[in-house]
From Swiss-Prot:
Record-linked HAMAP family: Recomb_XerC_XerD
Domain Tyr recombinase: 124-306
Keyword flag Lipid metabolism: no
Protein name: Tyrosine recombinase XerC
Length: 315
């Protein structure tokens, strides 16, 4: 099984173009399964799988251990050792993907995890920002440095087009159509889509890309957003700067760049955009994913109703 684990990780990297974050999660989740199956077969523990070095001489691990019963026992152990439901569901998803790969490559006759269901998650409604909070956040970057222009531009694009943080960092200069105010986005699973930008976002993007201090450090000539060394900006850097701006504006530290994606989706819905259009703009595979914003919008309307209705104010 070990060589199959590595073949699967190689497939994700080279054929599916999975992000480093995704690869790390798969590597960690399959390592966890490997550890469990080693215990089941009374093998001594071996090092976890590695994305960088697959030269370790692992003892044989038979596919005969890769059964529905053992997968169920593994998931039960994960729950009993206080792993979150979200983690358990992710690990089951990794196992199912690996099993599908094995079936496709005729390593096993059928997928033993296909009919296994993970623990049900409570529906957590995203809490969007108000428009005033969005404006306060956008005003946080200081514009005396090129990094301030960059960060203001990032925030404008998040709110303008509802982009994921990974889509922002992957954005290239060639993906921008300034004349039509459109962006060519490569989303999850290599899915591509075209999304519009607001005039305000276009102006900030032009100001940032034409900033003389940007050109003086530029080393990556394709990337749209650069760090202070002139290389492509990372998601970790965006997260770190985002937290600094939250602190500066006094907003909750639980807010993330993805919150702005939830926010613009909710604002679109409240202003009359239909769900199908929102689905296409956000790059959701399923309309069911987009439907959550109808619940958010109704929750906000109920809150405003409760806070402003005359009968409630009289209490």
């Amino acid at each position: 099984m070990i060589t199959s684990f590595y073949a699967f990780l190689d497939y994700l990297k080279n054929m599916k173009a999975s992000s480093l974050h995704t690869l790390r999660n798969y590597c960690m989740d399959l390592s966890s399964l490997k550890c469990f199956l080693e215990k089941k077969s009374d093998l001594s523990p071996t090092p976890p799988l590695s994305l960088h070095d697959n030269t370790y001489d692992y003892p044989p691990l038979s596919f005969s251990l890769f059964t529905k019963d053992n997968i169920r026992l593994y998931l039960l152990e994960q729950i009993q050792t206080h792993h979150s439901k979200r983690t358990v569901r992710r690990r089951l998803s990794a196992i199912k993907s690996f099993a599908r790969f094995c079936v496709k490559n005729q390593l096993i006759p059928e997928n033993p995890a296909e009919m296994i269901r993970g623990p049900r998650l409570p529906q957590e409604l995203p809490s969007p920002l108000t428009y005033e909070q969005v404006l306060a956040l956008m005003a946080a970057p200081e514009l005396d440095k090129v990094t301030g222009f960059r960060d203001r531009c990032l925030l404008e694009l998040f709110y303008s087009s509802g982009l994921r943080i990974s889509e922002i960092t992957a954005l290239n200069r060639a993906d921008i159509d300034f004349q039509s105010h459109l962006l060519h986005i490569r989303g999850k699973g290599k899915k591509e889509r075209i999304v519009p930008m607001t005039k305000v976002a276009v102006q900030w993007l032009q100001d940032y890309l034409n900033h003389p201090d940007r050109a003086s450090v530029e080393q990556d000539h394709q990337a749209c957003f650069l760090n202070r060394f002139g290389k492509r900006l990372s998601t970790r850097s965006i997260d770190r700067k985002f937290q600094q701006y939250l602190l500066k504006t006094g907003l909750s530290g639980s807010i993330t760049p993805h919150t702005i994606r939830h926010t613009i989706a909710t604002h679109w819905l409240e202003r009359g955009m239909d769900l199908k259009t929102i689905q296409l703009l956000l790059g959701h595979t399923s309309l069911e994913t987009t439907t959550i914003y109808t619940h958010v919008s109704m929750k906000l309307k109920k809150q405003i109703h409760d806070e402003t209705h005359p009968h409630n104010l009289e209490e």
